[in-house]
């Protein structure tokens, strides 16, 4: 057994050497991995030339508290190797708290953005609920059947569409039949046209036992659907209870049913929550996420951007020219000779004043007056003269 263990350890070491050699040969600046691969990257990190970032795509409980899933019973390995990464990204402040509390690991929060923008929105008059999910234990489909059975006893109009597939498909379909609600549940299966179902529904349901940062909620908000979800994980960071949906107590199917009935029987409430959901969707615009990730990359690489070096002056300038300098953080600066600075900025309709106002303001500073300043503006033809 000792020989076998020694041989296995030797094989692992050889594989690690192979990966280190390959990754270093690629001359990457930053390597990003997700889920369990983050632990493996942490093992390689000290030998890599690139900066390293691990990225969690589920909540702390979903990774560490579920038997035989991802980091189950691997706390010691996480404590040993995740700190070797340059950054470890989590989805919410709750995850940040739990990693620090239980493992003493520092993390950084980056939320997932919405994946699309839709001009078309749902019809609040529709009497259809929607679920978009995988048929697995974590998604709480058994809890959904229990809640919807009780709902159907008090309502004879609404239907439930469920799109998705998975290992528990047959079990959940059988459960619906056993409860006598099979004529009220439309099991769609996998579809290439989820938009059709979002637009034909007016309320989205998410009875999950655990979630990280569910993309389906942002999809629902983008189409104007309020969301009912059990109060678990980061749900209250996404759903404003009573405004963009409801957060019944975790796994209380009766309270989940009550929330469904409340929305189903009040069209004006659905309209109000639909408007709120659309507004809330703007919080998850991809442009905001890109900005946050760009800042992270600059910090990890030790790049001090134009904005970082001149933040004090820029903030002062914003007070003086509030409409002219809001895009200053997008300016890139290159010192190409001792007394020459090249700036790269973007224009866009009406935005030529942004870098120009900032430029004039910086010239008031003594340390900039001996330099030649060259500005390169993208989309110049789209600007005002």
Residue ranges and their predicted role:
Residues 190, 209:
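Aromatic "clamp/platform" in nucleotide-sugar-dependent glycosyltransferases that forms part
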Residues 33-38, 56:
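Short His-centered aromatic/hydrophobic patch
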Residues 20-21, 70-88:
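Membrane-proximal helix-turn-helix segments that form the acceptor-binding/catalytic region
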Residues 127-150, 167-173, 254, 353, ...:
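A conserved mid-protein helix/loop that constitutes part of the nucleotide-sugar donor-binding site
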Residues 79-118:
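Donor nucleotide-sugar binding/catalytic pocket of nucleotide-sugar-dependent glycosyltransferases
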Residues 2-5, 9, 13, 181:
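Single conserved hydrophobic/aromatic residue that forms the stacking wall/gate
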Residues 217, 226-229, 239:
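Short hydrophobic beta-strand element within catalytic cores of glycosyltransferases
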Residues 241-242, 246-253, 262-267:
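Conserved acidic donor-binding segment of nucleotide-sugar-dependent glycosyltransferases
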């Amino acid at each position: 057994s000792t020989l076998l263990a020694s041989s296995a350890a030797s094989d692992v070491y050889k594989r690690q050497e192979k990966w280190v050699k390959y990754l270093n040969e690629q001359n990457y600046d930053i390597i990003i991995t997700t889920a369990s691969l983050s632990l493996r990257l942490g093992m390689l990190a000290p030998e890599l030339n690139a900066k390293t970032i691990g990225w969690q795509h589920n909540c702390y409980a979903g990774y560490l508290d579920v038997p035989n899933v991802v980091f189950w019973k691997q706390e010691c390995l996480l404590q040993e190797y995740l700190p070797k990464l340059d950054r470890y990204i989590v989805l919410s402040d709750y995850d940040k708290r739990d990693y620090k509390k239980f493992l003493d690991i520092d993390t950084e929060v980056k939320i997932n953005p919405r994946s699309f923008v839709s001009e078309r929105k749902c019809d609040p008059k529709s009497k259809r609920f929607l679920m978009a999910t995988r048929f697995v234990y974590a998604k709480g489909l058994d809890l959904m059947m229990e809640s919807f059975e009780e709902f159907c006893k008090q309502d004879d109009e609404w239907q439930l569409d469920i799109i998705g597939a998975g290992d528990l498909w047959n079990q959940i379909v059988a459960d619906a039949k056993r409860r006598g609600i099979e004529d009220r549940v439309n099991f769609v299966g996998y579809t290439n046209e989820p938009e059709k179902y979002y637009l034909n529904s007016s309320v989205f349901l998410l009875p999950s036992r655990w979630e990280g940062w569910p993309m389906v909620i942002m999809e629902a908000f983008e189409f104007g659907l309020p969301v009912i979800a059990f109060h678990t994980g980061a749900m209250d960071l996404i759903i404003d209870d009573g405004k963009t949906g409801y957060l019944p107590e975790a796994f209380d199917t009766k309270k989940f049913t009550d929330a469904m009935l409340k929305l189903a029987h009040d069209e004006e409430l659905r309209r109000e929550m639909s408007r709120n959901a659309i507004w809330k969707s703007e919080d998850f615009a991809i442009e905001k996420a890109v900005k946050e990730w760009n800042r992270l990359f600059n910090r990890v690489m030790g790049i001090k951007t134009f904005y970082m070096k001149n933040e004090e002056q820029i903030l002062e300038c914003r007070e003086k020219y509030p409409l002219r300098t809001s895009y200053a953080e997008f300016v890139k600066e290159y010192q190409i000779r001792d007394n020459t600075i090249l700036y790269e900025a973007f224009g866009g309709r009406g935005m030529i004043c942004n870098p120009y106002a900032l430029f004039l303001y910086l010239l008031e500073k003594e340390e900039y007056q001996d330099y030649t300043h060259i500005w390169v503006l993208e989309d110049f033809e789209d600007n005002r003269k």
